[in-house]
Amino acid sequence: MTTNRKDEHILYALEQKSSYNSFDEVELIHSSLPLYNLDEIDLSTEFAGRKWDFPFYINAMTGGSNKGREINQKLAQVAESCGILFVTGSYSAALKNPTDDSFSVKSSHPNLLLGTNIGLDKPVELGLQTVEEMNPVLLQVHVNVMQELLMPEGERKFRSWQSHLADYSKQIPVPIVLKEVGFGMDAKTIERAYEFGVRTVDLSGRGGTSFAYIENRRSGQRDYLNQWGQSTMQALLNAQEWKDKVELLVSGGVRNPLDMIKCLVFGAKAVGLSRTVLELVETYTVEEVIGIVQGWKADLRLIMCSLNCATIADLQKVDYLLYGKLKEANDQMKKA
């Protein structure tokens, strides 16, 4: 059952198209008089207890099936070659089936910066087992309540999640990242997570892979909930009061380096990509995808140069305009 579900997730993730993307409602103000040479632009950033050379990473997607194994190997090769973080999909399938090797990418990619993922429904003992078996540089702990509720076989008991989060924060020996799955993390959740000791979150807003859409495609029910949650940029705007206390990672509908820059302008430490990279490895050879991802680094530098930003931190000084739904919501927030 798990294998079929994981393959369905891949299939439906690739087929869905979003008519709205909140990044399109942000315009950055160009600077006509440059201050820096292109080779002075520094893309490095810091989060989860370490310095990273580049402010983007391949976010959690898949595992738990033969198709998932194939995709994870491709993604690991891309990430290792490009020197970026790669986070596997939820390790729960391997916890249920010890023979599942679809997450085992480190042996063939020894220099890979590897993260892995587990659901908050799992007690900390399983999180510790995951870390022991995968040896990741960080552990994403995902919260996916709407997805669980829409899954016929999904979780129905949630009272333990907060105590689990407290346990993860205290006992997991590597940095943890509390991660949404495309519904947009709200500010109250960030506040509660902070009280439990969490210092890094992935807001993961609506606009990319929708697990509401995926589960409704599987069950044929409740498609009126396909657009549930906050868009990625809206979630990031909502989290502004927390950006000096909590490291904000952003994912959900990120398509290109310009979208990445817009996230960084609003205080993100780094940006995760899932479906964009999945589409690439399913369309092109691994070598071609490596070339595309390396090109993103060059594009980030040239955009930063045109905005007079030598560092990622400088981007938070960039002026911008908001339009449409994003402007309306932001105006409401200012009045509240």
From Swiss-Prot:
Catalysed reaction equations from the record: isopentenyl diphosphate = dimethylallyl diphosphate
Gene Ontology annotations of biological process type: isoprenoid biosynthetic process
GO MF entries: FMN binding; isopentenyl-diphosphate delta-isomerase activity; magnesium ion binding; NADPH binding; oxidoreductase activity
UniProt-annotated binding residues for FMN: A60, M61, T62, S90, N117, K179, S204, T209, G253, V254, R255, S274, R275
EC number(s) given by UniProt: 5.3.3.2
Chain sites annotated for binding Mg(2+): E148
Record flagged with keyword NADP: yes
Gene Ontology CC annotation, any one: cytoplasm
The entry's keywords: Cytoplasm, Flavoprotein, FMN, Isomerase, Isoprene biosynthesis, Magnesium, Metal-binding, NADP
Keyword flag DNA-binding: no
Chain sites annotated for binding substrate: R5, K6, Q147
SUPFAM superfamilies: FMN-linked oxidoreductases
Cross-referenced InterPro entries: Aldolase_TIM, FMN-dep_DH, IPdP_isomerase
Compartments reported by the entry: Cytoplasm
Cofactors named for this entry: FMN; NADPH; Mg(2+)
Complex formation: Homooctamer. Dimer of tetramers.
Described function: Involved in the biosynthesis of isoprenoids. Catalyzes the 1,3-allylic rearrangement of the homoallylic substrate isopentenyl (IPP) to its allylic isomer, dimethylallyl diphosphate (DMAPP).
Family label: Belongs to the IPP isomerase type 2 family.
NCBIfam families linked to this entry: IPP_isom_2
Protein name according to UniProt: Isopentenyl-diphosphate delta-isomerase
Lineage: Bacteria, Bacillati, Bacillota, Bacilli, Lactobacillales
